[in-house]
Amino acid sequence: DDVYYNIGKLMYAYQLSKPEKTYKDWTYDTALKNVRQAIAIDPLPIYTQMEGDILFAQQDYAGALAAYEKVNTSNIASPATFFSAAKTKELLKGDPKEVVALMDSCIARCPQPITADFAPYLLERAQMNMNADQARNAMLDYDAYHTAVKGEVNDVFYYYREQAALKARQFQRALDDIAKAIEMNPTDLTYQAEHAVVNLRVGRYEEAIQILNNILKTDPKYGEAYRLLGLCQIQLKKTDEACGNFKKAKELGDPNADELITKYCK
């Protein structure tokens, strides 16, 4: 069984390296056949895990998930095997809450408190929590990640955590995080537009307008800024100006402008 497993493993590694021309019959199919022969002789969990990895590489996600689920009930279940199952279920468009549950099992098996080595799992679960509409839990995962890596994070981290905070209606936290992202990367207009969005959500329309005007000074073709400007003006009962900006946003290809024109502009 060991020989079959090792041949299968070699072929899998070879195919993963994306060879120009396949050597003899070193394909995923042959790798799978070898690993399944090993399983027939002795169904060791490590063989089943290899079977899952090959099926995953072949994009047979249902088969891969079945293999990973077997491994997860065995004595070699680990953070990595539960992570594989969670990612596979996500690719199968499974229930987002079930994906999070698999990620919970992954993280529960990590050394506690979580160290920097295992911290990427927290980022993955944060994203999965967002997909499952559990923004507060996502925010807590980002907090735990920040602790695990001792605050060694970049602007993208603050942008993602801000989005979780905003969705969780933690507006002050959202404002603080987006300000931090901008401080670390002042030229990224996405962050500035997001800063305007948070201000708009908390009713600070004048602040939002000022931010948006600054964006348009830098890039007069930034369609989203015109749409957001229009939304601020609607709140300030300046419908004509707002409609002009929605129209401008539409001309610049903003996909959300049409709906606003229908709603507010005769």
Language model feature labels by segment:
Residues Q37-A38, K70-V71, S105-C106, A144-Y145, ...:
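Canonical positions in the second alpha-helix
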Residues L231, Q235-K266:
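Terminal, low-structured helical/coil segments at or just beyond the last alpha-helical repeat
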Residues V3-Y5, Y47-T48, T81, A116, ...:
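TPR alpha-solenoid repeat register
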Residues A40-I41, T73-S74, R109-P113, A148-K150, ...:
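Structural marker of alpha-solenoid helical repeat scaffolds
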Residues N6, M50, S84, E124, ...:
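Canonical tetratricopeptide repeat
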Residues A13-Q15, A57, L91-L92, N131, ...:
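Register position in tetratricopeptide repeats
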